[in-house]
Design a protein with these regions (language model features):
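Metal-coordinating catalytic core of metallo-dependent amide/deamination hydrolases
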Residues: 65-121
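Metal-associated gating/positioning segment near the N- to mid-region
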Residues: 2-62, 84
Length: 121
């Protein structure tokens, strides 16, 4: 058994902009299934996704059971507007905005809350 502990199903590791464009209108189920199938073939049974702003990781979690994968996601990361995190999350401006995003994540069934507090290391 193997696990992927820092995935972003919305990304492809080649071209971020092209990968995200595949999901702009709605999560692209065919692309998501390609990722899930590749993980299944690699005997990966646990995936911890970092979330995204388009609902892609949320849909992946819904489909993952078909592939024998335990899929966890925050649905989206939470970041302060104008700071690092826009590629995988939603912004807040003040404490009330932050509270609303946490409530939204809970409502959508987030497995954990991801808070962006630093940039790329």
């Amino acid at each position: 058994m193997f696990g992927e502990c820092h995935a972003h199903v919305i990304m492809d590791g080649k071209n971020y902009k092209a990968a995200v464009a595949l999901h702009k209108e709605r999560p692209n189920e065919a692309v998501i299934r390609e990722h899930l199938s590749a993980w299944q073939q690699a005997d990966i049974t646990f995936v911890r996704d970092g979330g995204d702003a388009y609902g892609v990781s949320e849909r992946a979690r819904e489909l993952a059971g078909e592939y024998g994968i335990d899929y966890r996601t925050p649905i989206f990361a939470i970041h302060k507007r104008g700071h690092y995190g826009g590629i995988v999350g939603l912004p807040y401006d003040d404490r009330q905005g932050y509270r609303e995003l946490v409530q939204e994540a809970r409502k959508r069934g987030a497995d954990f809350i991801k808070i962006m507090i630093s940039g790329i290391m």
